[in-house]
Structures are given as C-alpha cells and as structure tokens.
A protein has these predicted regions:
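Interface amphipathic segments
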Residues: 1-260, 266-365, 373-378
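Acidic, contiguous internal or C-terminal segments within carbohydrate-active enzymes
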Residues: 370
Length: 378
C-alpha cells in the first residue's frame, strides 16, 4: 500500500516544516522544507548555538532509518559567542551520522571557512573531517575555543583536521597566523603546526617573529601524563609582547632565553636560562640582567639573578614558592610559603634592584657594601 501526502505542514520549537511525497510500506519518498529552525533547543547538548536555519531536501530511507539529504543555510549563527554569517552547504543525516559537504561560512570581516565532515550520532559521537580557513579572525576563533586574548589580532590561514569524539576531540591545526599584531605593533606571520590527540598536546612548529627576534616552541604535553616542551626566545623586544598581559608594565629590553619544561604536566619541572640587555623598568636603566633558575614541586629556585649597570652588579638567589606569588597576606619568617631570598649588593648601584625583585621594591640610587639576607613578603 502506498500513502500519498500533499501539502504536509508541521511545527516544532517554533519552526515550520512543509512536505509532500509518498510512503510505501516503511519506505519514505518525500521532498521537505524547514523554515525558521531555531537551533538552540536542538543542539543544547552539543554547543551554545543560537540562530535560525533553513533546510530543503529529500527524505528517503525507511521509518526505522530515515535519511535526509539536502541543503541548509543561515544568514547568521552565534556559536559560543562567535558570529558566523552566510552559512551555506549540503548535509546528509540519518539516525547514526550527520555529514556536512562543502559547508561554507564567513567569520569576521573577511574570514571564509569550508567544512567537510561531521559527527556520528550514536555511541561516543565520533568526529571526522576537516576545515579550511582563509583569513579567519584570530580573536573570534580563540573566543570560540574559550581562550581569551588581550590586545592581540591576526588572520588564520590553513587547515584543521578533526577526529576523536565530542568529549575528547582530536584537533590538528597547520597553517599561518598572518598580520599578527600585539597592541599597536605588527609582528608579521607566525608559523603554526599543533595538534591535540587523545589529551596529548603536540607542538611541531610554533614560531612568532617579534621585531628582529623570534619566539619559538616545540614539544608535547600529555594532559594526564608527562611534558617535554622547549621554549626559546632570541632577541625578543619585550615591549612588543607585554600588551598581551592586558596590563601596563613599564618594562623594556631585549630578551634571550631557553626554557625546558619536563616531568608531570600537572606539576612540571622547569629549567630556565635567560639574558636581557638594555633593560628599563619604571625609567631605571640596566645594562644587562641574566638569570639561571629552576622550578620543581611548585618552588622557583633562583641559582643566580644578576643585574649589571656599568661596573656594578647586584645578585639575588634563593627560593620563591608559587604560593607566595598568589597571596596578599603576611607570611612570617620560616613559613614554607614565604620567599627566602639573598640580595647581595657589593659596592653596588641599588637602582638595578627594582628590576630584579619579585615585588618590585623601589630603592633609591646609592652605593652600599653589604650582603643582605631577608624574607621578602608579598
């Protein structure tokens, strides 16, 4: 027996659906159109999505396994606060999978994306496919991922490969960040090749030009295991990067450093060697500051932190527990959370010390022969 339906009208969550066709036994053969489909109630278990969608296509398969193939579109969608416009593409949907084909959308002033792929609708909700990006807005995309950047803009070009599942996605990004700008400073083009797979974050390439210098990183960090990452800076002008912090920090200088991060990701060990030249802090000039330090068990151990101005040097060494940096209360001598530092000034110009001390103690410019050991309190 064949059931013929003409001018079918239905509604759900404020959306209107129209169709016509036949059903022979359990076999479906309908042309359907959906208008003003508000996505929030349909996708609330997957993402924070707001906006209206239209869908037009063919409904086939059976009543046990209906299949929709057609085209979808939206003038404007908002996903996790990021606005996407001119959403257009093809889609295949059955009870087990949703698969987008050539799903294009615009983002920002000139960003264009095309998605090929989708997600299984049963079991672990597996992700598959890839997306290409052309001039994607960096700030909007980091907001989409829940990451907030301060005073930083750029255009992402490249490809993102998707895998894993909805709760534990695999994401691989390879491309460039063009016109990377921090504050008012155009840094240039950054090379990026990073991946997140089974909660293991891998940095194959990360290079950021900073003036005449370069900031780079490589390695991996298992979110449930160990870390092995190297970060390096060569001739980096600090004044070009500090706007990222979102704070006014009166610090300038050319920085070189190598940092090795290893051990447990949740409690890593850090080995740092750094050198800064032509540094100023609050108008105080220092020829050179260099340091060797480690961090282990959440305690920074300074082997040496030396500030040099002309023929004079000041030295700091000792321990800084991370807890001391996050408290505003008084820590008595002997408290394991308190800083324990030695400040060695031997015939020195003490004006270099504000640049070296962790709580930026302001000292007048003078000379002193002495060795001081004291507990520095936040």
């Amino acid at each position: 027996d064949t059931l013929t339906v003409r001018n079918l009208t239905a509604s759900a969550y404020g959306a209107s659906f129209y169709g016509g066709g036949t059903m022979k036994g359990k076999t479906l053969d309908f042309n359907v159109f959906g208008d003003k489909i508000y996505l929030a109630p349909w996708l609330k278990d997957y993402a924070d999505v707001h906006g209206y969608l239209t869908a037009e296509g063919h409904l086939s398969g059976t009543t046990d396994k209906p299949i929709f193939e057609g085209n979808i579109g939206s003038d404007k969608l908002r996903i996790n606060g990021t606005v996407l416009t001119n959403v257009r593409g093809s889609v295949y949907v059955d009870p087990t999978v949703v698969n987008f084909k050539n799903l294009g959308f615009d983002q920002g002033e000139k960003g264009k994306f095309v998605l090929q792929g989708g997600m299984t609708l049963t079991g672990e909700h597996r992700l598959f496919g890839y997306a290409t990006m052309n001039d994607g807005d960096l700030t909007s995309l980091t907001n989409l991922a829940g990451v907030k950047l301060h005073n930083t803009t750029g255009l992402i070009n490249g490809r993102v490969d998707l895998g894993g599942n909805l709760k534990n996605p695999d994401i691989a990004l390879k491309g460039t960040i063009d016109d990377l700008t921090v504050g008012d400073h155009l840094l240039g083009t950054s090379q990026v090749d990073v991946a997140l797979q089974n909660r293991r974050f891998t940095v194959n390439t990360f290079q950021v030009p900073v003036g005449d210098g370069m900031l780079a990183a490589a390695g991996h960090a298992d979110l449930d295991g160990k870390t092995d990452i190297q970060i390096a800076a060569n001739k980096v002008d600090l004044s070009l990067l500090l706007p990222i912090t979102g704070k006014e920090i009166p610090l300038t200088g050319n920085l070189n450093f190598i940092a090795n991060v290893s051990g447990e990701t949740r409690n890593p060990k850090v080995e740092l060697s750094a050198d800064m030249t032509n540094a100023t802090y609050n108008g105080v000039f220092v020829d050179r500051v260099y340091a060797m330090a480690t961090m282990e068990d959440k305690v920074i151990k300074i082997q040496q932190l030396v500030g040099q101005r002309g023929q004079y040097k000041s030295k700091i060494y000792g321990d800084i527990p991370l807890a001391a940096l996050y408290t505003s209360s008084y820590l008595p001598p002997g408290d394991k959370s308190a800083m324990d530092l030695v400040v060695d000034v031997n015939d020195e110009d003490l004006a270099v010390l504000p640049l070296m001390t962790p709580n930026s103690i302001a000292l007048s410019s003078s000379r002193l022969r002495n060795s001081l050991k004291k507990m520095l309190k936040k």
